Curated annotation (Swiss-Prot):
UniProt KW keywords: Carbohydrate metabolism, Hydrolase, Magnesium, Metal-binding
Gene3D superfamilies documented for this protein: HAD superfamily/HAD-like
Keyword DNA-binding tagged: no
Assembly behavior: Homohexamer.
Top EC class, one word: hydrolase
Organism for this UniProt entry: Corynebacterium glutamicum (strain R)
GO molecular function: metal ion binding; phosphatase activity
Protein name: Dihydroxyacetone phosphatase
Cellular component per GO, a single term: cytoplasm
Catalytic site: D10 (nucleophile), D12 (proton donor/acceptor)
Site (Orients Asp-12 for proton transfer during catalytic turnover): R56
Keyword Hydrolase: yes
Reactions catalysed, as given in the entry: dihydroxyacetone phosphate + H2O = dihydroxyacetone + phosphate
């Protein structure tokens, strides 16, 4: 019997919470590594590079290599490269986004760029936003890394990409195309990167509106954990349901190969060459 399963998992609320590892996350990831299971950790955070996030996760007790981390910035760079192999963009964002675009072979410029790309930053500049508005009015296409309207900080809630995008839309009339969750484009690009198929992949998340929705729309089985922001009352608010609901990722550490208890990802050896 062969196990044919891959995983996409959200980061905040699933693996870590407020900078601390959620108990059992290390055991789950180690089970995947020990059994050569393909997986990718997803985050709508575009501030940090995968290498930065890998280092931060390590301080929380999770050893996840950069190539196993897929941010909304890397997904955005992947998408843009699929549209224009070597394009030009004016970027409002931090190193996670600029590094991803440079790596994809793009040129960052404010001189008649093809795209304006808006990402997360802790210090939105009025001057940069004004430049973005005028470039869009001049014909640049508008892309955003993710639709989140707020984000957490030590001092409280901060306006995030979605809020600033709304300001730019109000000034230009241009609606952005969002790449990050819940857009299934982010899931598809992550799947392609690890060579996985949606039919054999499980998405683990803590949010109905992003994680479960994007997994559902990408054709994945979904697991919602209660260790983040969602509870049973939150689940009932939506017209769709996850495949399975668990308390935390620790519940999957010992059943990673059969998360729903139905043997759906077990393939008889004689069939693995005929699919």
């Amino acid at each position: 019997m062969t196990v044919n399963i891959s995983y996409l998992t959200d980061m905040d609320g699933v693996l870590i919470k407020e900078g601390e590892m959620i108990p059992g996350a290390d055991r789950f990831l180690q089970s995947l590594t020990d059994n050569n299971v393909e997986f990718m950790v997803l985050t709508n955070n575009s501030i940090f590079t995968p290498r930065d996030l890998s280092a931060r996760l390590k301080t929380s007790g999770l050893d996840i290599p950069p190539e196993r981390i897929w941010t909304s910035a890397t997904a955005t760079a992947h998408f843009l490269k699929s549209q224009v192999k070597e394009g030009t963009a004016y970027v409002v964002g931090e190193s996670g986004l600029t590094t991803a675009l440079h790596t994809a072979g793009w040129i960052l410029t404010d001189a008649n760029p093809e795209f304006v790309v808006l990402g997360e930053t802790r210090t939105y500049s009025f001057e940069a936003i004004t430049t973005a508005i005028n470039l869009i009015l001049g014909g640049a296409r508008f892309i955003c890394t993710n639709p989140d309207v707020t984000g957490p900080s030590p001092s409280g809630i901060l306006p995030a990409t979605g809020s600033v995008a709304a300001l730019i839309t109000a000034a230009t009339g241009a609606e952005p195309y969002y790449i990050g969750k819940p857009n299934p484009v982010m899931m598809r690009s992550a799947l392609n990167t690890i060579g996985a198929h949606s039919e054999h992949t499980v998405m683990i998340g803590d949010r109905m509106d992003t994680d479960v929705k994007s997994g559902l729309e990408a054709g994945l089985s979904t697991v919602l954990v209660r260790s983040g922001i969602s509870d049973d009352a939150e689940i009932r608010r939506y017209p769709f349901r996850p495949t399975h609901v668990i308390n935390s990722i620790a519940d999957l550490a010992d059943c990673w190969d059969d998360p729903f208890g139905d043997g759906a990802f077990h393939v008889p050896d004689e069939q693995q060459f005929t699919d």
